[in-house]
């Protein structure tokens, strides 16, 4: 998955998370065109917030006007990241890098 290119319509951060959960955990997450409020509402119904990250937990990252989602594993966060007009791709960031780049970071564990 690392290196898979970002596409806002076909493979954005929510698509990546849905693929991760489907491939690794056999959990189907609805895919949305872009990460939006409806996904957050769905997430809060099916995940429980946890204080510390655990392998395969969902990571919700927020900055001023943006929400972003990834998955915690291998002591960091895998996420499909795009800056400006770059192509973007799936990357793995250490947790400290995530915390420095986003104002609010929360962790969510599958609850069903």
Regions found by a protein language model. Name each.
Residues 5, 20, 46, 77, ...:
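Intrinsically disordered, low-complexity N-terminal regions enriched in serine/proline/glycine
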Residues 1-2, 87-112:
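Non-catalytic ligand/cofactor/substrate-binding and regulatory segments of enzyme domains
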Residues 32-87, 91, 96-97:
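...with weaker cross-activation on analogous glycine-rich loops/strands in unrelated enzymes
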Residues 2-54:
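Catalytic cysteine-centered active-site loop
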């Amino acid at each position: 998955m690392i290196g898979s290119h970002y596409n806002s319509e076909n493979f954005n951060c929510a698509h990546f998370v849905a693929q991760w959960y489907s491939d690794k955990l056999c959990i189907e997450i609805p895919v949305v065109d872009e990460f939006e409020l409806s996904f957050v509402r769905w997430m809060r119904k099916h995940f429980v917030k946890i204080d510390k990250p655990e392998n395969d937990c969902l990571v919700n990252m927020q900055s001023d006007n943006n929400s972003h989602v990834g998955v915690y594993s291998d002591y960091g966060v895998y996420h499909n990241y795009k800056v400006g007009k770059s192509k973007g791709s799936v990357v793995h960031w250490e947790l400290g890098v995530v915390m420095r780049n986003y104002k609010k970071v929360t962790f969510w564990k599958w609850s069903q």
